[in-house]
């Protein structure tokens, strides 16, 4: 679900203080975008939203969430309706819970 090697790599690249800011910004922006996913939007907007979410997720190691976003992005690109937008939200919530729980342990070590 989470690529911890990517998380560690990013934290080492930017430092602990900046990493905390990046995590806070990521969670806020992604949560907001996920909450506004709507199957009634034009496919081009859904594709754009899922592309943004995928890229953001990959930067912070949310691989399962990113993979689901990628699946939806491809469907939207090819004119297919992606009916799993609820799964995208669920995947984000599950990933977020795991990430925050494990991150506390990782930082404490």
Where are these regions (language model features)?
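Two-component system phosphorelay core
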Residues: 1-48, 52-109
